[in-house]
């Protein structure tokens, strides 16, 4: 049998095939450009996320430092509270209800009675007049040793 001879391709068919291939190539090129744009946007978003992560890390380090300081201060305040509780428990303190001096110094005056001699101190009232104390008056706790230092010497 004779092999079938290849049919000649008409120039019109060839031109149509080339045009179809050009359209397909143009479509693929447009899709490739779209993918390149999406890749660029994704890379930009990734860089922004990395920058934000670094900023959050720096802020977190600062917050950890502040938290550490707060925990140290809390420990100090806890010890001071325990000391005051011990003083109250042992009734080994004097209470003064005096405002601080104009320059922040402790006022020089005679101390209020101790809780041993006057167990019913009128809290929030002036010992002299009985009037309510204003918020600028503060409670100061003094041990008897500290009170001795406040008293003028009798030399």
From Swiss-Prot:
Residues 98-132 are annotated as: Disordered. Residues 16-92 form a coiled coil. It comes from the Eukaryota. Keywords: Coiled coil. This is Protein ZNF767. The lineage of its organism: Eukaryota, Metazoa, Chordata, Craniata, Vertebrata.
